[in-house]
Amino acid sequence: MLGAAEVLASATFDADGVPSGHTPKADEGRFLLKILWLPDNVALAVDQIVGGGTSPLTAYFFWPREDAWETLKTELEDKAWITDNERVEVLNKATEVINYWQEEGKGKTLEEAKLKFPEVTFCGTA
């Protein structure tokens, strides 16, 4: 199974800079977990990989301000075209990131989080 980063890395761009290429099929890394890394919160969102680019699939859900994991789970379950394996893969990675942030990540920089989870897209101020 190709990961999201591998799919995006294989994308080609036309003369106008528009990504084109392979849209992954079910269980081929069709989704990209995005994390907003902040000092007092971590937010999670999912993008779908389409035609070599990405398209937002969910809004950002904040932890611990709200139960981001449960909200993300509900959002993914509401999309019947997402396979169980894909949903589990995204939620497992979200669990890893939340646990890391809770246990040791609050004191870690954004760059340290990126190194810990290279397959996840990060942005933020921490």
Curated annotation (Swiss-Prot):
One of its GO terms (cellular component) is ribonucleoprotein complex. Keywords: Ribonucleoprotein, Ribosomal protein. InterPro entries: PSRP-3/Ycf65_sf, Ribosomal_PSRP3/Ycf65. GO terms for molecular function: structural constituent of ribosome. Disulfide bonds: none annotated. Pfam families: PSRP-3_Ycf65. One of its GO terms (biological process) is translation. HAMAP family: Ribosomal_plastid_cS23 (MF_00619). Probably a ribosomal protein or a ribosome-associated protein. Belongs to the chloroplast-specific ribosomal protein cS23 family. Part of the 30S ribosomal subunit. This is Probable small ribosomal subunit protein cS23.
